[in-house]
């Protein structure tokens, strides 16, 4: 039995040696591509190419590694390669170990520089001024609805949406003490609300203390006795806390969608989504006529959100997501028709319609 075990381990060692050699060969090719991109002025990060690579890898996989594991492995490979091509800076709404941070890692891996910032406005500003290459912003949550501040920032910004990230939100009870010793729980109001039923059943007598972020809750709990935090698994890992109960949110469909913002949006992939905004005149049927443009050219409109313009009373901007790329023929025709019925149309970006 021991001989068999040693043989298998030796085989794994041989495969690991081959993997390292192949990874280095792959990286050399990536660096050559980076030189070509740099010479032509192309963006180093290409969401369309990333999507194609991940889809191909998943299609080639025949087990036993599941698709999610293959994506995670190749995400880190691509992250390390990107870091060698150019030390990209990814700005996000901080602090560290929040779900925004987890979204950054899911999309960009852990080899690039992640820059936590205090506000959504700061993320837009850093990318606009070139101090960050890309920004990651929350746009909507399946239980809490739209993140209106992100929508508002697009009104005057020239930045474009170049990718999206869909992240399952999984809240966890963590502490530095046994579960039965926990008397106080720290977190933000939204997390307490999303775990209300679980708390009533499992910790009805615990004192709930609100903090500025779930990360701050984990920081407090690291040193405070008899305290627990409701936060992300990344927070537990970062602050050395034990997860006492995992996935304690009341809804299993708690999902947040994030947008990646940059200076350009990628070319079409054949499976894309377009985000845009427009404004209509104050007349009967104006919005109906505008939306009919999508139906006329058989474009699936997947979301519409309205926001006050803040420039004139009762004037609104409408934000729309639709399937297809703005360079697709039918989408172009629909946008042309839309322009006839609106005061203005602004394309916010076209990007791969994947969960990131």
What would you call each of these model-derived segments?
Residues 1-356:
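Domain-level signature for soluble enzymes in the chorismate/prephenate branch of the shikimate pathway
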């Amino acid at each position: 039995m021991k001989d068999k075990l040693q043989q298998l381990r030796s085989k794994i060692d041989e495969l690991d040696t081959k993997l390292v050699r192949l990874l280095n060969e792959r990286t050399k090719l990536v660096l050559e591509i980076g030189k070509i991109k740099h010479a032509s002025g192309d963006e180093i990060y290409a969401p369309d190419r990333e999507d194609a690579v991940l889809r191909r890898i998943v299609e080639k996989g025949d087990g036993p590694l599941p698709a999610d594991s293959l994506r995670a492995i190749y995400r880190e490979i691509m992250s390390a390669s990107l870091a060698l091509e150019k030390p990209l800076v990814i700005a996000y709404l901080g602090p560290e170990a929040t779900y925004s941070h987890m979204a950054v890692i899911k999309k960009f891996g852990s080899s690039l520089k992640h820059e936590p910032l205090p506000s959504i406005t700061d993320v837009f500003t850093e990318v606009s001024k070139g101090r960050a290459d890309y920004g990651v912003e929350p746009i909507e949550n399946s239980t809490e609805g739209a993140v209106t501040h992100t929508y508002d920032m697009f009104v005057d910004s020239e930045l474009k949406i170049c990718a999206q990230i869909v992240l399952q939100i999984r809240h966890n009870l963590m502490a530095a003490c046994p579960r039965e010793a926990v008397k106080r729980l720290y977190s933000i109001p939204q997390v307490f609300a999303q775990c209300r039923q679980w708390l009533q059943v499992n910790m009805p007598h615990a004192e709930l203390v609100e903090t500025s972020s779930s990360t701050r809750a984990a920081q407090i709990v690291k040193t405070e006795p008899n305290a627990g935090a409701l936060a992300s698994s990344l927070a537990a890992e970062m602050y050395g806390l034990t997860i006492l109960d995992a996935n304690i949110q009341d809804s299993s469909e708690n999902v947040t969608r994030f947008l990646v913002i940059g200076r350009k949006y990628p070319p079409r992939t054949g499976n894309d989504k377009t985000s845009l905004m427009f404004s209509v005149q104050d007349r009967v049927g104006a919005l109906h006529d505008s939306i009919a443009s999508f139906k006329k050219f058989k474009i699936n409109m997947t979301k519409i959100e309205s926001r006050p313009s803040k420039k004139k009373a009762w004037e609104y901007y409408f934000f729309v997501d639709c399937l297809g790329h703005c360079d697709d023929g039918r989408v172009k025709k629909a946008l042309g028709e839309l322009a006839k019925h609106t005061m203005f149309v602004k394309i916010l970006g076209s990007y791969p319609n994947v969960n990131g």
